Amino acid sequence: MSIRFIYGRAGSGKSHYCLEDIKRRIQEVNDRNLILLVPEQFSFQAEKNLIKSIGEKGTLKAQVLSFRRMAEKVFDEVGGGIKKYINDAGKNILLYKIIEENKNKLKVYKTSAKKQGFVNLVSDIIGEFKKYNISPEFLKENLDSIENKSLKNKLEDIGMLFLEFQNRLSKNYIDLEDTLHILCEKLDKSIIFKNSEVWIDEFSTFTPQEYSIIEKIMCSAYRVNITLCMDALGEYSERESIDLFLPIKITERNILQIAEKNNIIYQKPVNLRCSPCYRFKNSTALQHLQHSLFSYPYKNYEKSTEDINIFKALNKYTEIDYIARDIVKACRDKNLRFKDMAVVTGDLDEYENLIKAVFNQYDIPYFIDKKREIIHNQIVILIISAVEILAKNWSYESVFRYLKTGLLDLEFDDIDILENYVLANGIRGRQWLDTKPWSFKINYGNFKEDDSEEEQEYLNKINCIRDKVREPILKLSNDIKGKKKGRHICEELYNFLCELKIPEKVEELIIEFRNTDRLDKANEYSQIWDIVVDVLDQIVDVLGEQSFGMEIFNEALEIGFSQYEIGVIPPALDQVLVSNITRIKSYNISALYIAGVNDGIFPVTISPEGIFTDQDRDELKQNGLEIAPNTRSRAFEEQFLIYATLTIVDKYLTLTYSMSDEEGKAKRPSVVISMIKKIFPKLQEKSNLLDASGYEGGIEAVNSPKVTFNMLISNIRRNLGHRENINSLWIDVYRWYREHEIWNKRLDTVLGAFYYNNEIKISDLVKIRRLYGKHLNMSVSRLEKFAQCPFGYFVQYGLKVKDRKMYSLSAPDLGSFMHGILERFSIGLKQKSLTWENVDERCCEENINDLVDNVLYDNPNSILNSSKKYKHVTDKLKKTLTRSVWLIAQHMKKGRFIPRAYELVFGEIGDFPPISIELDSGEKVSLTGKVDRVDTAKEDIITYIRIVDYKSGTREFKLSDVYYGFQLQLLIYLDAILTEFDKMTKGKSIPAGLLYFKLEDPIVRTKENIPDHEIEDRITKSLKMNGLLLNDVNVIRQMDTSMEKSSDIISVSIKKDGNLSKSKSSLATRKQFEILRKYVRSTIADLCKKILTGNIEVTPYKNKTKNGCSYCEYSAICQFDTSIKGNKYRIIEDKSDEEIWKHIENKVQE
């Protein structure tokens, strides 16, 4: 029995020495077993290296083991594998159930127990205890020695969970840590290591559990060889805070203590001196780096070198772009192959997608050495979502996540139709279980009010889709509803998956992925079904005989699947390795690129993790409960990891870092950058900060066809119209693309885009008629939309593009609801033979409350019935509507105008016929619409007409908006009503005005207490109606008989000379009203003509305060951009009312 250290710095050839040593032992011809022990993640590469060194025949005597493989081999020999192995999934599922049962007993973690991730934390610390040979009993025995009460409470909580976990586990199962514990016990009976020679390589530290196994091996083997990455053996001190090899020296000390304890012979160590190191025989610069890194004082490298490069990038993209270019260049100029190169980073998640995108552009084959989580696999999503539907009462998210997996026999169009219906009507929970067909009102789509047959057909389709969705889930629900045993639930879920033919569909997907060269996906799906079955088996194993509901099962499934990762097999031999720095040790690399050499990434920021803080760990160590290292110790390990990473390459080393993140925030380079710059003072740092677009000036820009094509286009774009400025290199490149048919077509397409404009014209009038309908019927609000932007009108009313209707209370929904209640209230007064003068405030409140309640009773699916939140909204609506009707009553009492009509409709089946507008072509356009209220006041044979429009938002009358066609509605309605009234009566109808009535219950803000009547006065004044009024004091006084200088009802005031003040209101004489009527008709005719001649120009308006694009929903469609030729705003000039009146009069006189 003996031990021997094989030591030397990185690159000295320790692994190579071990392989050669094994080769020599084979040639010596003896009966000893030869074993190479390596970490689990390096076992595959170690086997490749061993076979390459000793040949296939040599493997009969020599073998590669990891601790896990060793356990399997020993158990096969002497037994010990009687208990069933439980993996991380089963372990965490069991822990979840234990935590769920005991959460109310916890002192510290009672709240945390409910949070996601707590199971993993507890699992990790239990694993840590086991690795450090701390049992629940040992933990309990040492509790009294802990003085810190907070730490003691933590230990009591964790100890209770640990004990319960171990009690349940030990009956029938073992986990990985228990496996190593049993291995240690069984090694005495094994002959595998009897008189064998063992080489332990690629380790830097061991856990106490692993030390115990090594001790048993040392006591049994002929000799144990242990490689140590360090420059000298000997004493150490923990005060040596700058010692790079401190973690390794601690390992050396622990091994020597074991040897001394067991009287094991310490043989002369093998010192592999670096002069130069085996790895760096071709690079003196890399040799100097490994010798000087973290050495104090260090010696400068006074020569220039191309073996080490530093690149300062603007951002992560230019980092990876530089690396990709250099890889291609290395293959071309340095005779390297892709398999000789690697890209590593301290944050692979951050760089992975970027590397994929850029490397694909450069046609660089790559393999990302990273296990994939399966929680995002579509099979797993389908399973979890199906169970979540039952656990979360058919929530929208779970239902449609289940449907969109693409694994069901449903068309995606049908799923979209169903989703739109569900979202629009707020369908959830028990509504999915309703045996009656859904009959919620379809308040979206292209249906007319009277199109009930088409609507019913659509409803039938939706219910048909719904039934297809429900049937399998309802069957599953009937089989497992209530509290059932875990075994039964898993069996029924398995049957459910088989009925959906998921195994067959997985096979079909594997074939499809292979046929389309998506080998990574084929590899993933070839493993997924076995994982699904394994998770169900683990649940049956640990929870099979326990009864629980869907919530527990759903959590158990998620926890189980979250523990699985799929290893990906490299699809080819010649490809660039992309890896995290922690997985790169055992590869032979000629060119290494380290991306993201920024502060916090390389080295990574060390922060306390898990249950225990650094202070907790130190106190536990003092009380004989040593567990994993604290952040200080981990910082030493991170420092050694940096050293190991920088010295793994044998020819070329490149470090890149970025100066900013995606948001443009500054990032700092790592200390590693400044360290290397100091060691290599003549090293010239490269950068692209001055030319963020790349390297377009020189031959290095010519790369793969895809990338060079983009560079060419960039050059042409920059020098458009100035060909003489283009480098001759790019002229040659241009010719190359012209000579290749595929690229020639693409070049034509891209160059054509330089002259792109988004102007659209429809010259075919037949198409226009198809778009807008054969019958020329339209609403005035649509014409106002056209006036704002013709293209916006075309998209909304021609193409009928609409936002997805959501189950929410939008401003239009709110306005419609309030209009409906006001109409019902007003008609109700008529039916009861009441007038507004008979109404008091209590009557208003009672009637409004009854009306709102009745409407909501008749519409049970209304969003206002959906929650307490909307109950509060309903109460506010009642107050607002009560305020509004009471204010209307006040207006009526103060004036002589009386309501003549409510919700007066213009249309084929309306109160009045459609408004007819004759075009120059002789065609007639019929305008439809609705007026909220028409008031009249009689004076002899004259009838004054006033129309009132209720608005839930703020709306003011602006003459300029009338002039530009943005505010035509009330004027054309007024014109039509005057015309119809003249036909109906013998007298004369005169416009008194058009007004906007604001539906609001404002809050009065004041710094002091004021009486109620003053509050009411302020509210009344804040809700004055505004609009265009007839410039006639007598008529105005009929609207407010109590008016003196100013009115509390309308925004108008009287000057000292008795005339109306124009500064306070918009006024028009009778003549001006007549001119406006003609102007509005003429404007409407012009707008209709433009619509029917196919004008769909992208010409939004713009004034000082806003523009037509401000709230436009279709900007992504029109792509309006003032930088595109022909894209200009229609500037709306700021004119006074006097100027506008002149323009209107001139227009009418033409």
Swiss-Prot record:
GO terms for biological process: double-strand break repair via homologous recombination. Its cofactor is Mg(2+); [4Fe-4S] cluster. [4Fe-4S] cluster binds at C789, C1109, C1112, C1118. ATP binds at G8, R9, A10, G11, S12, G13, K14, S15. Gene3D superfamilies: 3.90.320.10, 6.10.140.1030, P-loop containing nucleotide triphosphate hydrolases. Binds 1 [4Fe-4S] cluster. It comes from the Bacteria. Keywords: 4Fe-4S, ATP-binding, DNA damage, DNA repair, DNA-binding, Exonuclease, Helicase, Hydrolase, Iron, Iron-sulfur, Metal-binding, Nuclease, Nucleotide-binding. Its EC number is 3.1.-.-. Coiled coil: none annotated. It is an enzyme of class 3 (hydrolase). SUPFAM superfamilies: P-loop containing nucleoside triphosphate hydrolases. GO terms for molecular function: 4 iron, 4 sulfur cluster binding; 5'-3' exonuclease activity; ATP binding; double-stranded DNA binding; helicase activity; metal ion binding. PANTHER family: RECBCD ENZYME SUBUNIT RECC (PTHR30591:SF1). Despite having conserved helicase domains, this subunit does not have helicase activity. Heterodimer of AddA and AddB. This is ATP-dependent helicase/deoxyribonuclease subunit B. It comes from Clostridium kluyveri (strain NBRC 12016).
